[in-house]
């Protein structure tokens, strides 16, 4: 006899075994008519509570939290379903699952502050590679594999960002990224629609915790998804037209900064710190477009970002305009970003220029992209036109299950609970 059903409330003696005949009482309770003595297999030294009402206890003793609350276990089962679905989906389309380095001398692939550590086996001299960083994204490693001749690759794994903690952010989290040679932005959108609509349909049929939440929230994942243009929507919301030198700010950054700072003052919006062009445009998006994204109960695709916001994406001249836009989209559901995807920049010359422009911002913004000379050297061997895509697994599970905190969908909770976990 084992499992939670055998342990009732109050003081439990532990996990026991018994041989007998399974039957039901007159009231329908499942029972065992013992034909042998009960044998204690493992003692329990504490009374098992009916519930844990103290939030600190729940976060710092995840073991007991999961033991007591079936709803917490249901979320982890839902997470396992999502991971299995993703692997099956990509494998069925000839994607190769790979594992790329978590430790390296330079964390790249995203704008974020990395965790830093040291490797004693590599030496501690000033010219050694003893200083290591935990990856903030697997992107640059996966694109190296595309260069190596693997046309379709994907990876599901942890990434680490030394940043703030809140209901939707944890320094350690899980992503799924894929890269496909010769895939266009339209291909990425079509695949995203197929993946998410299929995932939700299957989950509603097979995972009760997800079915209950999807119906309660009124979410609809039927394709095609709604598309929203970044620049035209922002201009409509603000009642103005941005000058080309702002949208082409990678070429005229200082003038763009001053224009945007004056605009922030007029609009009464606090200037982000640091006040780079990318940060300010991103802030305007959150302020004006964010409410539009948050009001929809269907997936919304935000696309045609200014070039400066996407240093790793291929860019092109906007139709009928004199500014350039990134071949990129983000997908939002209920105001929360789930997917980031774009056509990858595959020119080593253009990529170096974009890295160098980001390096100027790095003087005031520690999270700006650093120049990865190793990746640039790999690009010299020829990166074919490639589409790249990433989704946050934790946020996806939160959305599907209705979990309010990212710690609820992590096996042992967020970092605050992991540190000092009982």
Task: Give the predicted meaning of each segment.
Residues 1-422:
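Class II aminoacyl-tRNA synthetase catalytic cores and aaRS-like
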């Amino acid at each position: 006899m084992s499992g939670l059903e055998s342990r009732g409330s109050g003081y439990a003696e532990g996990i026991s075994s018994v041989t007998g005949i399974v039957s039901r009482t007159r009231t329908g309770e499942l029972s065992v008519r013992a034909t042998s003595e009960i044998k204690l297999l493992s003692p329990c030294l504490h009374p098992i509570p009916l519930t844990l009402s103290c939030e600190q206890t729940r976060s710092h003793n995840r073991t007991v939290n999961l033991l007591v609350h079936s709803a917490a276990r249901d979320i982890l089962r839902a997470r396992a379903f999502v991971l299995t679905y993703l692997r099956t989906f990509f494998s069925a389309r000839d994607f190769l699952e790979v594992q790329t380095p978590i430790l390296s001398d330079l964390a790249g692939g995203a704008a974020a502050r990395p965790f830093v550590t040291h490797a004693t086996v590599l030496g501690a001299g000033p010219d050694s590679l003893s200083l290591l960083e935990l990856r903030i994204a697997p992107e640059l490693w996966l694109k190296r594999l595309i260069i190596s001749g693997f046309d379709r690759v994907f990876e599901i794994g942890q990434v680490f960002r030394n940043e703030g903690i809140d209901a939707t952010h944890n320094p350690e989290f899980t992503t799924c990224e894929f890269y496909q040679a010769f895939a266009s932005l339209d291909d990425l959108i079509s695949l995203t629609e197929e993946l998410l609509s299929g995932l939700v349909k299957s989950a509603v049929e097979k995972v009760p915790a997800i079915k209950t939440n999807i119906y309660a929230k009124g979410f609809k994942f039927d394709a095609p998804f709604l598309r929203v243009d970044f620049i035209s929507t922002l201009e409509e919301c603000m009642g103005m037209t941005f000058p080309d030198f702002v949208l082409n700010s990678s070429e005229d950054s200082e003038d763009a900064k001053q224009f945007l700072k004056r605009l922030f003052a007029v609009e009464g919006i606090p200037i982000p710190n640091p006040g780079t062009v990318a940060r300010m445009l991103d802030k305007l998006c959150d302020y004006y477009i964010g409410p539009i994204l948050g009001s929809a109960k269907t997936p919304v695709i935000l696309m045609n970002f200014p070039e400066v916001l996407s240093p790793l994406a291929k860019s092109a001249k906007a139709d009928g305009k004199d500014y350039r836009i990134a071949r990129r989209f983000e997908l939002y559901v209920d105001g929360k970003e789930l997917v980031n995807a774009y056509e990858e920049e595959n020119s080593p010359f253009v990529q170096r220029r974009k890295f160098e422009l980001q390096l100027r911002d790095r003087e005031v913004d520690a999270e700006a992209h650093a120049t990865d000379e190793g990746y640039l050297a790999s690009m010299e061997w020829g990166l074919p036109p490639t589409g790249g895509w990433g989704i946050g697994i934790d946020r996806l599970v939160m959305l599907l299950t209705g979990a309010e905190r990212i710690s609820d969908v992590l096996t042992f909770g967020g970092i605050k609970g992991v540190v000092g976990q009982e």
